[in-house]
Amino acid sequence: MPLTMARTGSEIYVDVINGKDETRKFLENLGFVKGTKISVIMEISGNLIINVKDTRVAVSRAMASRIMVRAA
């Protein structure tokens, strides 16, 4: 399922990142790597605040829709 469908407070794992090479590289540099455990902290003004490797990262809904996740 896309990250945009994950519930706030849920812990999930990154499964696949879709998009162009530069998009995938950008998200990987933020810590979104296959198998990484992440959690949705909150949604503010259409952006998702995600906990990735003990760091909070804000991503747009458009960018989050490219990140496929699976349940923890």
Pin down the residues of each PLM region.
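C-terminal structural segments of small proteins and small subunits
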Residues: 3, 11-12, 41-72
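Short, conserved catalytic or interaction motifs in soluble domains
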Residues: 19
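Short alpha-helix capping/helix-loop boundary micro-motifs
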Residues: 22-26
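Charged, well-structured alpha/beta interaction segments
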Residues: 29-30, 42
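Hydrophobic beta-sheet segments that form the core/acyl-binding groove
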Residues: 38
